[in-house]
């Protein structure tokens, strides 16, 4: 129950007090962490790997640079960036959820990604890094879970170096109406059943579907990034807008 005096936000389709959302999202990801990679492959039929590959290709990351993989989870992007920046560069895998961070650290160490990767538990709304630290920041399927997205975007802008870029990979609004209806049917009816069968957790995947619906559409997120200070903001619709990659620069 939310008191009238409390500031509210959404948790999926629920209206909750702002201070409650972070804990509720944390519960979701504590629950799904061990099955996160398996569920990503099942939910997207493996296409998430292509979306992430495109993000890497658009990042412009070079040897010797410093990269922040925010809401980096199990480290798919970090693994690629680690090879790209080489021994003279650095990648920080940051996530607010310690269960996801532990899964990412274990996974990357098991495949030999060590030496130039650091792990930091961090809230996107108040990043614990100095101004002008990173050449590139990515946040992949994480922004929709943030309570105050505008505050998080301003925090990302602050820690980017001049000339740096932010890439936001996130579920978005399909641009083809028949696909939009089919996507809703899949998200709200099939996805929770897959979550129940594979992860024994239908509720977390019901939240996933609801959080996608509540996330700002392509043009709204573009304006939010511009309002946070980013310039030359553009976006790419992937899989007909099921996912969008937004990119903006700090000059």
Curated annotation (Swiss-Prot):
<feature type="binding site">
    <location>
        <position position="95"/>
    </location>
    <ligand>
        <name>S-adenosyl-L-methionine</name>
    </ligand>
</feature>
<comment type="similarity">
    <text>Belongs to the class I-like SAM-binding methyltransferase superfamily. MenG/UbiE family.</text>
</comment>
<dbReference type="InterPro" id="IPR023576">
    <property type="entry name" value="UbiE/COQ5_MeTrFase_CS"/>
</dbReference>
<keyword id="KW-0949">S-adenosyl-L-methionine</keyword>
<dbReference type="GO" id="GO:0043770">
    <property type="term" value="F:demethylmenaquinone methyltransferase activity"/>
</dbReference>
<feature type="binding site">
    <location>
        <position position="74"/>
    </location>
    <ligand>
        <name>S-adenosyl-L-methionine</name>
    </ligand>
</feature>
<dbReference type="InterPro" id="IPR004033">
    <property type="entry name" value="UbiE/COQ5_MeTrFase"/>
</dbReference>
<dbReference type="Pfam" id="PF01209">
    <property type="entry name" value="Ubie_methyltran"/>
</dbReference>
<feature type="binding site">
    <location>
        <position position="140"/>
    </location>
    <ligand>
        <name>S-adenosyl-L-methionine</name>
    </ligand>
</feature>
<comment type="pathway">
    <text>Cofactor biosynthesis; ubiquinone biosynthesis.</text>
</comment>
<dbReference type="GO" id="GO:0009060">
    <property type="term" value="P:aerobic respiration"/>
</dbReference>
<dbReference type="GO" id="GO:0032259">
    <property type="term" value="P:methylation"/>
</dbReference>
<dbReference type="GO" id="GO:0008425">
    <property type="term" value="F:2-methoxy-6-polyprenyl-1,4-benzoquinol methyltransferase activity"/>
</dbReference>
<dbReference type="GO" id="GO:0009234">
    <property type="term" value="P:menaquinone biosynthetic process"/>
</dbReference>
<keyword id="KW-0474">Menaquinone biosynthesis</keyword>
<dbReference type="InterPro" id="IPR029063">
    <property type="entry name" value="SAM-dependent_MTases_sf"/>
</dbReference>
<protein>
    <recommendedName>
        <fullName>Ubiquinone/menaquinone biosynthesis C-methyltransferase UbiE</fullName>
        <ecNumber>2.1.1.163</ecNumber>
        <ecNumber>2.1.1.201</ecNumber>
    </recommendedName>
</protein>
<comment type="pathway">
    <text>Quinol/quinone metabolism; menaquinone biosynthesis; menaquinol from 1,4-dihydroxy-2-naphthoate: step 2/2.</text>
</comment>
<keyword id="KW-0808">Transferase</keyword>
<keyword id="KW-0489">Methyltransferase</keyword>
<feature type="binding site">
    <location>
        <begin position="123"/>
        <end position="124"/>
    </location>
    <ligand>
        <name>S-adenosyl-L-methionine</name>
    </ligand>
</feature>
<comment type="function">
    <text>Methyltransferase required for the conversion of demethylmenaquinol (DMKH2) to menaquinol (MKH2) and the conversion of 2-polyprenyl-6-methoxy-1,4-benzoquinol (DDMQH2) to 2-polyprenyl-3-methyl-6-methoxy-1,4-benzoquinol (DMQH2).</text>
</comment>
<keyword id="KW-0831">Ubiquinone biosynthesis</keyword>
């Amino acid at each position: 129950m939310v008191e009238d005096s409390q500031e509210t936000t959404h948790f999926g389709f629920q209206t909750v007090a702002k201070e409650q959302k972070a804990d509720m999202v944390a519960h979701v990801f504590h629950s799904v962490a061990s099955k996160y990679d398996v569920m990503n492959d099942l939910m997207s039929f493996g296409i998430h790997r292509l979306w992430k590959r495109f993000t890497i290709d658009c990042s412009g990351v070079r040897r010797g640079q410093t990269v922040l993989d925010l809401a980096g989870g199990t480290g798919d992007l970090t693994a690629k960036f680690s090879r790209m920046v080489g021994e003279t560069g650095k990648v920080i895998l940051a996530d607010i959820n310690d269960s996801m961070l532990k899964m990412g650290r274990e996974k990357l160490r098991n495949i030999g990604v060590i030496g130039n990767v650091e792990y930091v538990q961090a809230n996107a709304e108040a990043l614990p890094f100095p101004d002008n630290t990173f050449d590139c920041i990515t946040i992949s399927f994480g922004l929709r879970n943030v309570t105050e997205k505008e505050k998080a975007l301003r925090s990302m802008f602050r820690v980017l170096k001049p000339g740096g870029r932010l890439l936001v990979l996130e579920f978005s609004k399909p641009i083809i109406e028949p696909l939009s209806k089919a996507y809703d049917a899949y998200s709200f009816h099939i996805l929770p059943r897959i979550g129940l069968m594979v992860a024994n957790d239908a509720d977390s995947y019901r939240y996933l579907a609801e959080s996608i619906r509540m996330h700002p559409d392509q043009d709204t997120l573009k304006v939010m990034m511009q309002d946070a200070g980013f310039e030359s903001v553009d976006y790419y619709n992937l899989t007909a807008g099921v996912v969008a990659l937004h990119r903006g620069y700090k000059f």
